[in-house]
Design a protein with these regions (language model features):
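Active-site-adjacent beta->alpha loops and helix N-cap segments on the catalytic face
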Residues: 95, 121-134, 153-164, 182-208, ...
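C-terminal alpha-helical cap/extension of soluble enzyme domains
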Residues: 54-79, 275-338
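Acidic (Asp/Glu)-rich catalytic clusters
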Residues: 100-108, 126-139, 164-174, 195-203, ...
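N-terminal mitochondrial targeting presequence
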Residues: 1-56
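Active-site mouth loops of central-metabolism enzymes
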Residues: 80-98, 116-121, 143-162, 185, ...
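Conserved N-terminal beta1-alpha1 strand-loop-helix module at the mouth
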Residues: 53-130
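Structural preference for beta-strand elements that scaffold enzyme active sites
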Residues: 80-84, 112-114, 139-143, 176-179, ...
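Catalytic beta/alpha-barrel core
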Residues: 114-122, 145-147, 167-168, 175-189, ...
């Protein structure tokens, strides 16, 4: 088995040596060392210190706020359920001042920040580090997008070397999570697992992104996606189980395209099948539209893990809290946790 994420988070500091690292599975082949010291940082939140010092939101302040109003209290960070990851720079520019406004007002409700695709490579280093440091100060982990697809497909004859350099630079910048997407690539399952293990060995957390729609994750038109067709959902489920059970991956992302995005009818059967086979805390669903995350909360409750655009965080937080919603969820989202 691969080195579990939990052991990486609690194992202190360790040096990765040349060749097979201790505990690596037989899938791994000896490769040059990534000169990196592994620091402990949980996937569920980048820093817990900020969470305890953050002022109470008014909804949870019984003495001086609106705590008398019925609501669903949010679990404290770091969370493994009810996790919300938000999209950072992509559709809009986001710098430190913009992100500071988002996190100073809504940071309680944000667990992760994701840079879509390779958007982070378009920054100069100082403002990028400022964004990452700011997220960590608010107890928010930072994830790359699926840019490793570009690294794999454009690295010439030294793919392993390019991947190691990519991981080392992401680590040095302060990233916590590396998304492993293959929406545009045909990659053998064992190779995908090797990538996850390589990420773990670099002291980072792998977040495989899986979906039934080939060509998803970019700006491909709905008509083009439909002409490509979709994969059998069992392929996604089997791969997700291998990541979680065999490679120790803490959480996989389920791509929305082909399921709730760019489809004539939502494939809710795929979602139900995934959650029959995997625990809720090991899965995060992309919810590209408010009607989509409204459905997820209605069907699976407040504990479902969701990825949304940063512009939607207030709406999603209100829905999780049960203080507003659409006609089918308003006043209906509740919990029982005595």
């Amino acid at each position: 088995m691969a080195i579990p994420l939990r052991s990486l988070a609690t194992g202190g500091f360790r040096r990765i040596c040349t060749g097979k690292p201790p505990g690596a599975s037989r899938l791994l082949k000896p490769a040059p060392c990534i000169a990196n010291t592994i620091s402990s940082r949980p996937f569920a939140a980048a820093a817990t210190r900020a969470s305890s010092s953050q002022p109470k939101i008014l909804l949870e302040d019984r003495d001086n706020g609106f705590g008398f109003v019925r609501h669903n209290p949010a679990p404290p960070k770091p969370r493994t359920r009810s996790v919300t990851e938000i999209r950072g720079p992509y559709y809009t520019v986001m710098g430190p001042r913009y992100l500071s406004d988002v996190l100073e007002t809504m940071g309680t409700h944000v667990d992760g920040l994701k840079f879509a695709g390779g958007s982070f490579s378009l920054f100069s280093e100082r403002p990028l580090r400022d964004i990452i440091d700011l997220a960590h100060a608010h107890g928010v982990y930072v994830s790359t997008g699926g840019w490793i697809e570009h690294v794999l497909s454009s690295s010439g004859g030294d793919i392993a070397g390019a991947v190691d350099k990519y991981l080392a630079k992401c680590k040095s910048l302060g990233f916590d999570v590396i998304e492993l997407s293959t929406g545009f690539l045909s990659l053998p399952p064992d190779d995908w697992l090797r990538l996850a293990e390589r990420v773990q060995n670099a002291g980072l957390k792998p977040k495989p992104e899986l979906g039934i729609q080939f060509g998803a994750g970019g700006d491909t038109s709905a008509a083009e996606l439909q002409s490509i067709g979709t994969s059998d959902p069992s392929k996604v489920i089997n791969m997700a189980k291998r990541f979680v059970k065999d490679a120790g991956v803490e959480r996989v992302m389920i791509e929305s395209e082909g399921i709730t995005e760019n489809v004539q009818a939502w494939r809710t059967d795929v979602i139900q099948s995934i959650l029959r086979e995997l625990p809720l805390e090991n899965v995060m669903f992309e919810a590209a539209d408010p009607s989509v995350f409204n459905w997820y909360i209605r069907e699976f409750g407040v504990d479902v893990n969701l990825f949304v655009d940063h512009s939607q965080i207030v709406q999603l937080a209100g829905l999780r809290a049960g203080i507003w919603g659409k006609s089918d969820t308003f006043g209906k989202i509740t919990t029982y946790r005595p």
